[in-house]
Amino acid sequence: MRVFVFGSSLTSSYWNGAATYYRGIYKNLAELGFRITFAEPDAYGRQQHRDNEDFSYANVLIYDSPRDIPFLLKQACESDLVIKHSGVGVDDALLEEAVLDCQSARTQVAFWDVDAPATLASVEADPLNSFRALIPEYDFVFTYGGGPPVVEHYLRLGARACHPIYNALDPATHYPVDADPQFACDLAFVGNRLPDREHRVEEFFLAAADATPEFNFLLGGEGWGGKPLPSNVRWIGHVRTGDHNRINCSARMVLNINRESMASVGFSPPTRVFEAAGAGACLITDYWAGIEEFFTPGCEILVARDAREITDLLKTVDAKLARELGESMRRRALQEHTYSLRALQVREILHQSSPGVLNARHRDLYRQLA
């Protein structure tokens, strides 16, 4: 099956939290025989911060938007499946509508949402939102997470079906390595500074650092320059994918903090959770509904509802216990949460549905109702 993808970036994780997800999904689909073309815009400095990885499993097209979009759409229409990811970052509204023109007796079109809470909030905030009327026209809607709340929401908006394809582990890229003294710390957090994350980073990570000056904290990610930090917090800037393992294996514990929108919806384990699991790191996460669907709290993952609970864990979980928890989490991830399993799930969904164009009568009726 030939698959043409529009996404933010496969080649760069710079200001692009979906990079690990894209790589895991498309590399493993390629291993199942899918032929992947991934089109990403030259935007946000990502091409100046490309990761040093092997992307030979996909034909990567770097384009200028909107100039190159008509040419790309012509190529896309020759594929068996066209995927438009949310959050491409440039001309999203144009692409969301334009890809639907590729639908034919041979070509199906999917919308793959990598930030469903933000997408759905945008739709609900504006009754005239252009994407709302397009949802029923896609052959498939996939989401990066969100579980039952997101599935039900998309179905209410007219989606034919909604399939969560959760983040996972790629054991070929995220695995245990020797500790690196330059990243040694008691607690590490890696995440870009974003509007609906910053307050939670202050509430969980920075407040815990303030309360425990005897411990060392490591902060990675873009945007934190100029942010007042406690003296025991060291900021290291953008963390390339190749450094994930060294950080995760050098910290006594690693912290995951979901963005506010993701935490409120639940069922959205981010890439950082599985990156840490692959390295066998001891992970503390903020609480969100659905955690137990992925890992067992207290046995495979630690859960903290506020900074006080984080400081309690820092004081009570020694290096030996941290290693044991990390090893348990890694075993569970390898058994149930790999990208090879997610790719099989996608293939099964695609094979259950035969190609076809949305019935014109159905389309016209929905547009009248919308």
Language-model-derived ranges and their functions:
Residues 2-5, 9, 21, 34-40, ...:
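Nucleotide-sugar donor-binding catalytic core of glycosyltransferases
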Residues 7-12, 21-24, 37-62, 156, ...:
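Catalytic binding pocket for nucleotide-activated donors in carbohydrate/polymer assembly enzymes
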Residues 65-67, 115-116, 167-170, 307-308:
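Short, acidic/turn-prone active-site loops that include or flank metal/cofactor-
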Residues 68-72, 130, 242-243, 309:
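Short acidic active-site motifs
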